[in-house]
Amino acid sequence: MRHGNGQRKLNRTASHRKAMFANMAASLIEHEQIVTTLPKAKEIRPIVEKLVTLGKRGDLHARRQAISAIRDVKLVAKLFDTLAARYATRNGGYIRIMKAGFRAGDNAPLAVVEFVERDVDAKGKADRARVEAEQAAEADAA
């Protein structure tokens, strides 16, 4: 008997699952929208919701717990400053999961995971900054 059936194993070891969810949570906080498979999306939602709640709590212990979960100080700063302020009046339900069809290669169900009331400009921000830096370097070299 499997009492209290827990999370999905997703055909990975426990350490691989933990690392994958940490990376997915970091990507979601950075870009505010990611595309992944539906089972992964359903598993990442409670993780990120708890991180946002930590951000709303705002104390030092909560910050250290968030750092141990996503391992990126800049993203923790965004979580505690930007996202906590954005969702200060909302009690849960910070994440939206929308089905997005099926993947071409293996027909896996896809889903878009995004923050409710997300910042549209956050997606691809790092790529735009990198491209602008490369173009500035090329202009200086020429």
UniProtKB/Swiss-Prot annotation:
<dbReference type="GO" id="GO:0003735">
    <property type="term" value="F:structural constituent of ribosome"/>
</dbReference>
<comment type="similarity">
    <text>Belongs to the bacterial ribosomal protein bL17 family.</text>
</comment>
<dbReference type="InterPro" id="IPR000456">
    <property type="entry name" value="Ribosomal_bL17"/>
</dbReference>
<dbReference type="GO" id="GO:0022625">
    <property type="term" value="C:cytosolic large ribosomal subunit"/>
</dbReference>
<comment type="subunit">
    <text>Part of the 50S ribosomal subunit. Contacts protein L32.</text>
</comment>
<dbReference type="InterPro" id="IPR036373">
    <property type="entry name" value="Ribosomal_bL17_sf"/>
</dbReference>
<dbReference type="Pfam" id="PF01196">
    <property type="entry name" value="Ribosomal_L17"/>
</dbReference>
<dbReference type="GO" id="GO:0006412">
    <property type="term" value="P:translation"/>
</dbReference>
<keyword id="KW-0689">Ribosomal protein</keyword>
<dbReference type="InterPro" id="IPR047859">
    <property type="entry name" value="Ribosomal_bL17_CS"/>
</dbReference>
<protein>
    <recommendedName>
        <fullName>Large ribosomal subunit protein bL17</fullName>
    </recommendedName>
</protein>
<keyword id="KW-0687">Ribonucleoprotein</keyword>
